[in-house]
């Protein structure tokens, strides 16, 4: 991979990572909140992000085999979005938690295989049109951020569209 291509892909990858950081900061406090989590919660967070990332990698690998152009570009964006955040969680766990917690994480995931598959996908970016990948990245970011409002005024006036179909819950009225 040429230095220019590496820089271009790295820029797209970083843009998606920064968006993932922002998304997770809004959704669950992000990396800054990790110090407040128990070891069990850290294990759950790492394993959950691992599973999400693995699923995105598998979908992208399948799209490459099927030569499904839309899913290839979407998949790369999803992989970039999820992998770097997974990596950040893993680095935190390895650096800040006790050996027992790290050993539990290691017993539940295969970070080396995931990393190798990620690198294999990175090497295939030479086959992509990076302007299209960049456009997809913007769409993925926009879609994910639409899940939250950035307006405090809008948030204060938000009302659920949920209409209960019954007043019964847990067998009681």
Predicted regions and their residues:
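Flexible "arm" and connector segments at domain edges
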Residues: 1-173
């Amino acid at each position: 991979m040429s230095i220019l291509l590496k820089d271009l892909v790295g820029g797209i990858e970083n843009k998606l990572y920064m968006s993932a950081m922002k998304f997770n900061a809004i959704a669950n406090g992000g990396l800054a909140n990790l110090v407040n989590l128990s070891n069990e919660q850290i294990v759950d967070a790492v394993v959950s992000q691992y599973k999400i990332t693995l699923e995105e990698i598998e979908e992208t690998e399948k799209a490459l085999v099927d030569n499904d152009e839309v899913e290839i570009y979407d998949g790369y964006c999803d992989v970039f979005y999820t992998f770097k955040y997974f990596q950040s969680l893993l680095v935190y766990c390895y650096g800040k938690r006790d050996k027992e917690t790290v050993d539990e994480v290691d017993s539940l995931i295969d970070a080396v295989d995931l990393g190798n598959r990620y690198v294999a996908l990175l090497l295939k970016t030479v086959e992509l049109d990076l302007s299209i990948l960049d456009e997809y990245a913007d769409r993925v970011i926009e879609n994910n951020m639409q899940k939250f409002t950035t307006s405090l005024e809008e948030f204060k006036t938000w009302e659920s569209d949920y209409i209960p179909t019954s007043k019964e819950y847990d067998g009681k009225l």
